[in-house]
């Protein structure tokens, strides 16, 4: 069975646009298919949109840009989101993803709790919980690709999937 596109967006990202995207998600995500999937995917979308906004590589005269697509098939929901980021940020991101993808769900939960209790806030205002929260909700590895845009930045795409627990 081929995937159905539930939501697609490409353009600038602001807090107002994040709110609009999340509202559209709530309207388009089927209520009856998998309520647990809807809750998990909503949490994943919030984290991904905030991260794409916060870690976007742009000049002061540019608005941050993203691409986003949410699809579903019989058993899965898949969010693909991309944005331009500094190569330094992407190196940290992909290193963390590679590390976290090797962990079990219980290890991810434990690391999440340790990170909360450590209380360290980064210079960008985060605590490093976003990826862990995404992985806790997804329960599947994050797939990523990067494409260089110039010497200092690249476009990074993340693909996050959720499998309907009733259809596993």
Model-derived regions, located:
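Short alpha-helical basic/polar micro-motif
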Residues: 46-47, 132
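A short, charge-rich alpha-helical start-of-domain segment used by transcription regulators
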Residues: 15-22
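Conserved short strand/loop->alpha-helix "switch" segment adjacent to the catalytic nucleotide/phosphoryl-transfer site
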Residues: 23-46, 116-124
């Amino acid at each position: 069975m081929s995937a159905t596109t539930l939501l697609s967006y490409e353009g600038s990202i602001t807090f107002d646009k994040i709110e609009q995207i999340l509202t559209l998600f709530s309207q388009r995500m089927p209520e009856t298919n998998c309520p647990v999937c809807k809750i998990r995917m909503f949490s994943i979308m919030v984290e991904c949109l905030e991260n794409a906004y916060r870690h976007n590589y742009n000049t002061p005269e540019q608005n941050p840009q993203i691409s986003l697509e949410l699809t579903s098939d019989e058993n899965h929901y898949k969010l693909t989101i991309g944005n331009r980021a500094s190569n330094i940020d992407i190196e940290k991101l992909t290193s963390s993803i590679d590390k976290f993808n090797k962990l079990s769900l219980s290890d991810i939960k434990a690391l999440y709790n340790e990170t909360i209790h450590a209380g360290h806030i980064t210079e960008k205002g985060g605590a490093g919980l976003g990826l862990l929260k995404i992985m806790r909700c997804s329960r599947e590895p994050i797939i990523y690709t990067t494409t260089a845009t110039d010497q200092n930045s690249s476009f990074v795409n993340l693909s996050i999937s959720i499998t309907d627990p009733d259809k596993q």
